């Protein structure tokens, strides 16, 4: 509320929309853009984690759309991983041998993990084999199945949450790196 009253605040002078009002606003915007510019690319930028994946999934089949946090960051990271493997004399298939620690479970972290996972599966690992090569750490530490993940935006994490016997839920990033030995 203080920000809304700040004379230097350039944003819209009303509280953030939530719930059905938010969903209706996004729907109206998408419909309006598609009616006016049917071939336009709609870029979703800096959406809250609790909305980002849901909105992308809702509209990706009906509109040309892209979420920079989920897809853009992930594409750059995947390209970097492929580039690093090439510099080390490897090939794309070598992604199946990698272990990843992802620091952050927001839109970007989930997108990165998802893209890397898809690349591993495309190179021959089963989905479960690929999931087992990931360690996801958020502000509360390592995420395992001991932690309830039922809030908005948690869907992309579900496959990565494993029954870990090597590290307990909430293990620090340093402890996870030491144990996981990411490549």
Describe every region a protein language model picked out.
Residues 62, 67-177:
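Glycine-rich phosphate/diphosphate-binding loop of Rossmann-like nucleotide-binding domains
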Residues 181-183:
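Short, intrinsically disordered, charge-balanced linker/junction segments flanking boundaries
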């Amino acid at each position: 509320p203080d920000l809304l009253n700040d004379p230097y605040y350039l944003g819209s002078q009303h509280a953030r929309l939530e719930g059905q009002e938010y969903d209706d606003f996004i729907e109206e915007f998408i419909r309006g853009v598609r009616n006016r510019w049917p071939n336009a690319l709609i870029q979703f930028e800096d959406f809250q984690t609790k909305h980002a994946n849901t909105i992308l999934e809702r509209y990706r089949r009906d509109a040309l759309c892209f979420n920079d946090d989920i897809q853009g960051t992930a594409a750059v990271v995947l390209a970097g991983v492929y580039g690093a493997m090439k510099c080390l004399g490897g090939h794309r298939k070598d992604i199946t041998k990698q272990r990843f620690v992802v620091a952050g479970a927001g839109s970007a972290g989930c997108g990165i993990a998802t893209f890397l996972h898809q690349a591993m599966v495309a190179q021959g690992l089963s989905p479960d084999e690929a999931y087992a090569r990931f360690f996801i750490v958020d502000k509360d530490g390592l995420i395992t199945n001991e932690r309830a993940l039922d809030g908005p935006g948690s869907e992309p994490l579900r496959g990565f949450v494993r029954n870990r016997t090597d590290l307990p839920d909430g293990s620090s990033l340093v402890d996870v790196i030491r144990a996981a030995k990411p490549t």
